[in-house]
Structures are given as structure tokens and as C-alpha cells.
């Protein structure tokens, strides 16, 4: 046992076990004459650990070597005394520390590490503007990894039909962004996302759609594509080993693999590297661009627009066994189960569509999907009767903190998937630094809506998790808010291989 003082324990540490001191029985020690006080005072005081270690070995030879009885007695009685004394002192210090209230203890403050992050907006068909922002400071924006420039946020810049890039460096705030395209009354709004080794996108009509694969990495990527349709899995020639060069974008017409007109979901998996995948749909009735998402057992589709004429739920089962999905609508008057959506069965490796037009009755809602195994889902909506635009409502995260940078005015919808009312507050920071406060209460299982007056960075903080999105004021498009993970007392690091 060490003779140094024990340190105070932090709140999350377990107390160190103190070894029990065992005394040597008198019968185990050979009898010796007592030493006089003058003999003991002449000897140096031994270290406690050293004194405990100096127990003579058994045998006559070792006893004969101890020719100074006075020294022998001093070593034997001082060792245990020192050990017991130090043990008592250490125990007293430990008890005293535990008696101090937690607020009075000194603890090292752990500062969260803000690592760099790169986001990519898949390119749209029309001329698009990129909106990038964060809680403050500046970000790098541009149309490729090699063409980035520093800008104060929030910022708007034209990217036309190119992919939009947003990058933060170490120490900068967490970025968010979106790309908005609006031409001829048809609007697309797609979030900027981080690269991954795979993802899924869904379209209603593969004959008029294409995949867009963006490689924002510094090395080449090789991807495989699998399509899940109403008749099951579709793997045809040309869907394997597709190479995308570093910093390049590859457009893959889906009609080459499936020329049908029923919904399909494309699963894109990168054998090498990381990619960002988008899907672009165009037709006489409108256009839309969506970004890849991941399968999950619980999915949220926030900000379903009100007064739409068509609402079709597209669900895919990427697994190998049949599963069941239930749908709950979070509406202004409270939660309800849409007719025909209480239990939806889906065969493995297939995609189905469920018409919710009458069940939702044109009400603005958020949807929650629950399944036995991970599923993929989106909601296809068409505008008011007589309009031509459409949109895909994509999944959004549930969190106490929601953020997004929007490129235009719109309607904010927040839904509460919990069982208790949620109060929230936040603000919209405009492109010129002006701030607009946003606050309210969302009852349990309900949806709240309010105006987003202009472009800017939107930051919402709730008393409990919320889901949300912004619906465009012009045309028909829905942009999901990004869930921001709550900071913990530790380091949170996102490693970006592009930051060398």
C-alpha cells in the first residue's frame, strides 16, 4: 500500500478498494527480548512498506544472522503500526471527500471538440441556390472540393446545376445547408448531407428519374446499385462496380434498369470510398430532388403539407423477411391512425405504395412509422387541384435541438411524437444578421405551424424531442430539419478524411 495521500474521487469514479491489513500472529514470531528505549531511539525510522517487507525467513540460519536484537524488535513492531496508521488516514480522507456536496467538488471541465465536417447537396435539374449556415462564424462553400471559398454565415450562393459543397474546419460551428431550385412554378428543395458508405432513395416513376452519385472524397469510389420494386429485387447488368472518380458526379438514368411507372427504391452501397446519393424526378406534373437516407425501425416524415390533392406513402423492405408497418399521423387535433395504415405488410426486398389521400384529408401532419425491422419510406404529395408541382416528403430526425439553413421563406411545421406537451424557443438568423424569435408549445401527438419570414439559419430548442420541416412558400417542396445530437460531458468527434 502506498503512503501517498489518496486523491478525491470524481462523481463517475468507483472508490478504490483498500486492502485489509493482516497482523502477524505472535506465535509466528520467534521470542526476543524487549529493546530498551535508548536502543530504539538510536535506530532510523523505517519506511512502512520496507518495514513490512523485512520479515526474516524461517530457519535457524536466518535467525542467527540477526545479531542485534534491539534493531530486530524495532522493525517488527514499527512496520504494522505505520501500515495501520496510513490506512486509517486514507480511509478518513476518503470519507471526508464523500461528505462534500457534489456542487462543491472541483472537476475538470471537458470542452467538446468541434471537428471539420463536409456536407454535399445533390445537384438539381434547374438552377439552384445554396444556403449554408451555422450558429455563427464562417464556413467554406462552393461547387467542388477544389472550389471552396470562406464566407460569413448564413450565406446564399448560386450553384446552378452543380452539387453544392459546405465545409467546416476544426473549431467552427456545426454546419447545415440546403439547395433550392424554383423555375416555372416547380420547386425542389434538398438538404445537404454528409457522405456515407451507402444509402437509399425512392422515386415514384423510374422511367423519368435518375440517380446522382457524388464522390466528395479524395479517392475513387466504387458503388453497387440494387433496385427494390413491387415484384421484388431487381439486379441487372451495369448495376455493379460503378466507378466514380474523386470529386466527380455521375448521373445514372434509372430507366436503363427499370422502365416501369411504379415506385421503386434504389439501394446504393459503396464497396470503396464514401458517396452522397440523390434522386431526381421530372415529368409533366412537376419535378423533385431528394437525398439518400438510411433504413430504420422508427421513421419520421415531418411537415406533410396541408391541402394537397394526393398523398401516397412509398415503403420499402430492404430485409430478407416479411415485416409489418404501422403509421401514426401527428395532427393539429392530436394523433390518429390513417385508414388502411394500421398494419401494412411488406414482402422482403420489395416496395409498395399506400394511398393516404383520403385518410389525411389535406391536413398538415407529421407521420411516424414503426416496424419490426428497418424500413425505408417517403411520402409523395401533389399540390392543390389544378397545380402541377409535386414533392417527396423525406425522413427527418427527432431531437431536442433542430437546425437547418433555408434559402427562402416558408411554413415551419413542428410535430411532437411524445406523450407530454413540448415548449420550444428558437430564432431565425437572416442573411444580414437580423434575428426573428420563434417560440410556442406543441401538445402531445400534435403538430404546430408558423411562418418562416425569410431565408436564414433556423435553430430550434425544445423541452423534449420534436420533428420538423419547412414547406416552401412558392411551388411545393419540403425541407426536413436536421436533428442535432445533444452535447454530453465528453468529446464528440466527426472524422472527415478530406481534412488532412
Predicted segments, located by residue:
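Short, aromatic- and glycine-rich surface loops/edge beta-strands on solvent-exposed regions
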Residues: 161-175, 262-271, 364-372, 453-471
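Hydrophobic alpha-helical membrane segments, chiefly transmembrane helices and signal peptide h-regions
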Residues: 79-101, 266-268, 325-327, 367-369, ...
Amino acid at each position: 500500500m502506498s503512503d501517498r495521500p489518496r486523491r478525491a474521487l470524481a462523481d463517475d469514479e468507483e472508490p478504490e478498494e483498500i486492502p485489509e491489513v493482516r497482523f502477524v500472529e505472535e506465535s509466528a514470531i520467534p521470542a526476543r527480548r524487549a529493546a530498551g528505549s535508548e536502543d530504539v531511539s538510536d535506530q532510523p525510522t523505517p519506511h512502512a512498506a520496507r518495514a513490512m517487507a523485512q520479515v526474516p525467513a524461517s530457519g535457524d540460519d536466518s535467525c542467527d544472522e540477526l545479531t542485534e536484537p534491539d534493531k530486530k524488535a524495532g522493525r517488527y513492531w514499527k512496520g504494522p503500526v505505520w501500515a495501520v496508521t496510513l490506512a486509517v488516514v486514507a480511509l478518513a480522507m476518503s470519507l471526508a471527500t464523500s461528505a462534500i456536496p457534489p456542487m462543491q467538488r472541483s472537476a475538470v471541465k471537458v470542452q467538446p471538440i468541434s471537428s471539420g465536417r463536409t456536407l454535399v447537396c445533390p445537384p438539381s435539374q434547374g438552377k439552384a441556390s445554396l444556403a449554408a449556415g451555422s450558429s455563427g462564424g464562417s464556413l467554406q462553400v462552393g461547387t467542388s472540393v477544389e472550389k471552396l471559398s470562406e464566407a460569413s454565415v448564413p450565406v446564399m450562393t448560386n450553384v446552378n446545376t452543380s452539387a453544392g459543397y459546405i465545409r467546416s474546419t476544426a473549431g467552427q460551428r456545426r454546419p447545415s445547408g440546403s439547395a433550392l431550385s424554383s423555375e416555372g412554378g416547380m420547386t425542389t428543395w434538398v438538404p445537404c448531407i454528409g457522405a456515407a458508405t451507402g444509402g437509399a432513395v425512392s422515386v415514384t416513376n423510374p422511367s423519368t428519374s435518375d440517380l446522382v452519385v457524388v464522390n466528395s472524397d479524395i479517392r475513387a469510389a466504387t458503388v453497387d446499385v440494387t433496385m427494390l420494386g413491387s415484384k421484388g429485387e431487381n439486379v441487372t447488368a451495369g448495376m455493379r462496380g460503378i466507378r466514380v472518380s474523386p470529386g466527380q458526379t455521375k448521373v445514372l438514368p434509372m430507366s436503363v434498369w427499370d422502365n416501369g411507372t411504379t415506385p421503386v427504391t434504389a439501394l446504393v452501397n459503396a464497396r470503396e470510398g464514401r458517396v452522397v446519393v440523390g434522386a431526381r424526378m421530372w415529368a409533366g406534373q412537376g419535378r423533385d430532388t431528394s437525398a439518400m437516407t438510411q433504413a430504420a425501425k422508427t421513421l419520421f416524415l415531418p411537415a406533410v403539407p396541408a391541402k394537397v390533392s394526393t398523398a401516397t406513402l412509398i415503403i420499402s423492405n430492404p430485409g430478407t423477411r416479411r415485416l409489418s408497418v404501422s403509421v401514426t399521423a401527428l395532427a393539429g387535433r392530436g394523433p390518429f391512425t390513417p385508414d388502411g395504415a394500421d398494419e401494412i405488410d411488406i414482402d422482403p426486398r420489395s416496395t409498395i405504395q399506400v394511398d393516404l389521400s383520403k385518410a389525411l384529408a389535406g391536413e398538415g401532419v407529421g407521420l411516424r412509422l414503426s416496424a419490426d425491422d428497418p424500413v425505408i419510406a417517403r411520402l409523395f404529395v401533389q399540390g392543390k387541384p389544378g397545380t402541377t408541382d409535386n414533392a417527396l416528403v423525406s425522413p427527418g430526425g427527432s431531437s431536442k435541438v433542430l437546425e437547418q439553413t433555408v434559402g427562402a421563406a416558408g411554413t415551419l411545421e413542428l410535430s411532437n411524437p411524445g406523450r407530454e406537451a413540448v415548449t420550444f424557443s428558437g430564432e431565425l438568423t437572416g442573411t444580414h444578421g437580423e434575428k426573428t424569435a420563434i417560440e410556442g408549445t406543441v401538445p402531445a401527438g400534435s403538430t404546430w405551424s408558423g411562418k418562416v419570414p425569410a431565408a436564414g439559419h433556423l435553430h430550434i430548442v425544445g423541452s423534449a424531442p420534436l420533428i420538423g420541416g419547412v414547406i416552401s412558400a412558392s411551388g411545393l417542396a419540403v425541407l426536413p430539419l436536421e436533428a442535432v445530437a445533444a452535447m454530453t460531458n465528453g468529446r464528440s468527434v466527426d472524422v472527415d478524411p478530406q481534412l488532412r
